[in-house]
Amino acid sequence: MQVTETQAEGLKRAYTVVLPAAELDAKAQDRLVELKDKVRINGFRPGKVPLSHLKSLYGKSVMAEVIEQAVTEANGKIVEDNGLRLALPPKVELPQAEDEVKSVIEGQADLKYTVELEVLPKIELGNFKDIAIEKPVAIVTDEEVDEMVKRIADGNRSFDAKEGAAASGDRITVDFVGSIDGVPFEGGAGEDVPVVIGSNSFIPGFEEQLIGLSAGEERTINVTFPTNYLSAQLAGKDASFAVKAKQVEAPGELTIDDEFAKTLGLESLDKLKENVRERIAKEHEGATRQRVKRQLLDALDAGHKFDVPPTLVSQEFEGVWQQIQTDLQQQGRTFADESTTEEEARAEYQRIAERRVRLGLVLAEIGERNNIQVTDDEVTRAVVERARQFPGQEQQVWEYYRRNAQAMASLRAPLFEEKVVDFLLELAKVTEKQVSREELYKEEEEKAA
């Protein structure tokens, strides 16, 4: 085998490889000899088929198999001899000219091909003990618990039919048809829709204008869709709704006590509050984890600067970009609605794709050097947890993951990432800081705005 390096720039490598015809032909002959004892051909006793006859029948297919294996082995040797770690499978370019292919298959010419490799960078890991993390911790207050309990009670409040006009807090059932400039718009009509006045569940200004309506009465309501409304076709537009009241109901008495807790399957109000406190605490812990993890990943990104495999970045970008375009299309929005241009958005998501690839490589390197692994039991538990999200379809979900290696890998990857993050947090300088609920969620709320 003759190997000539033709490119060694950045993370790109390219080689021209020549596999001698004599070696390929010898391997093909060995294959035919093995085949001789296995095939059954009419007119010949087992094992007595002449090699020349076998070659006329199977020579081309056997040589094709030999070439495929020889190329794979040659590429593997190149990688091993040069101490390379591949980011992607080798890209092989075999001869295309018909006469050249014919000569190689018939064992009359050497096989000359090119192979392009994209390799992983050498990563110099930093000192993780120098990473400083501020861990925001929010204590669940009694006020938060009481507020949540009240919301639960409001959601379970009964309503009783009433005579007269609707007031704030009442539930009014309406039919409505919305229009813009006199033309009805898609999704703007509804029948028998219950609206709790003051719940802020509808477009700003809609609920307030229902006050004073009695069953059987009609009214035109004028509103303006928010500029950040989900549908770009409606955002910022003035609309009119022709509304007909069907029924008005007054809220029943709201009594939050042990009896109310029992209607929810709990033994007492104290038990309800305990459950609510645990739920809020779990939400706070999740928010804290995200804040801490983001700081850690930012530190890793800032502390590890190296070239990343361009094809990996391109693949990551294309996946993200396709999802962005799909989301915009489904929402009927454009980049202008997001206060940006397509060019600016592409540049931003290109940066995000590069960051994701870099962090993925850093985390993988840390995991490999520290023997961090995801066990089969951990993956199984993840599948079970996933299956629980689809009541009645647990078996189908299990079978899907069992038969789909890529889907199983999609569960293993985040488990691995979280284990590496846990490992790093044990090393980093983590300082707790008590914050309010508002401070804990402020960053996420600003991002959502």
Curated annotation (Swiss-Prot):
Molecular function GO labels: peptidyl-prolyl cis-trans isomerase activity; protein folding chaperone; ribosome binding
Enzyme superclass (EC): isomerase
Enzyme Commission no: 5.2.1.8
Protein location: Cytoplasm
Domain of life: Bacteria
Cited Pfam families: FKBP_C (PF00254), Trigger_C (PF05698), Trigger_N (PF05697)
Catalytically driven reaction(s): [protein]-peptidylproline (omega=180) = [protein]-peptidylproline (omega=0)
Ranges where the PPIase FKBP-type domain occurs: 169-254
Keyword annotations: Cell cycle, Cell division, Chaperone, Cytoplasm, Isomerase, Rotamase
InterPro entries (UniProt xref): PPIase_dom_sf, PPIase_FKBP_dom, Trig_fac, Trigger_fac_C, Trigger_fac_C_sf, Trigger_fac_ribosome-bd_bac, Trigger_fac_ribosome-bd_sf, Trigger_fact/SurA_dom_sf
Principal subcellular localization: cytoplasm
GO CC, alphabetical: cytoplasm
The keyword Signal appears for this protein: no
Any Gene Ontology biological process: protein transport
Domain notes: Consists of 3 domains; the N-terminus binds the ribosome, the middle domain has PPIase activity, while the C-terminus has intrinsic chaperone activity on its own.
PANTHER family (alphabetical): TRIGGER FACTOR CHAPERONE AND PEPTIDYL-PROLYL CIS/TRANS ISOMERASE, TRIGGER FACTOR-LIKE PROTEIN TIG, CHLOROPLASTIC
Matches recorded under HAMAP family: Trigger_factor_Tig
Known function: Involved in protein export. Acts as a chaperone by maintaining the newly synthesized protein in an open conformation. Functions as a peptidyl-prolyl cis-trans isomerase.
Family designation: Belongs to the FKBP-type PPIase family. Tig subfamily.
NCBIfam families tied to this protein: tig
Protein name: Trigger factor
Organism: Azorhizobium caulinodans (strain ATCC 43989 / DSM 5975 / JCM 20966 / LMG 6465 / NBRC 14845 / NCIMB 13405 / ORS 571)
Upper classification of the organism: Bacteria, Pseudomonadati, Pseudomonadota, Alphaproteobacteria, Hyphomicrobiales
